[in-house]
Design a protein with these regions (language model features):
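N-terminal first-folded block
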Residues: 6-36, 40-44
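Non-catalytic surface loops within mature trypsin-like serine protease
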Residues: 14-16, 62, 96-98
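Residues at secondary-structure transition points
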Residues: 1, 13, 20, 51, ...
Length: 105
């Protein structure tokens, strides 16, 4: 398989009452992340049925771009801002892109 985009889904469950603070910190992080050269897409999703659950969909040009993201000041600020809001450790699953072709992004 040729090199492909790295797609990461980060699943988060926040403590009751932490929804708005998590949303605000995550929106700021997502906006800054979208300006990184190795980021193709960076989405924040809220569960329709459970206001305490969120998913971050992060799409990077490479694993190196994902690693570089974790070295940015905005990621560090987000990580620190949301640490006490987490009801449980966040979980991430990594995928490779199959379709559409990477050039279609």
């Amino acid at each position: 398989m040729a090199a492909s985009l790295l797609v990461v889904h980060v699943h988060v469950r926040v403590k009751p009452g932490g929804e708005e603070a998590f949303r605000a910190a995550s929106l700021a992080n997502a906006g800054a992340s979208r300006r990184e050269p190795g980021v193709v897409r960076f989405d924040l999703l809220a569960d329709r049925d459970d206001p305490l659950r969120f998913v971050l969909v992060e799409i990077y040009r490479s694993a190196a771009a994902a690693a570089a993201h974790k070295e940015t000041p905005h990621y560090a600020a987000w990580r620190d801002a949301v640490a006490d809001l987490m009801a449980e450790p966040r979980r991430s699953t990594k995928y490779v892109n199959l379709s559409p072709d990477d050039a279609g992004w």
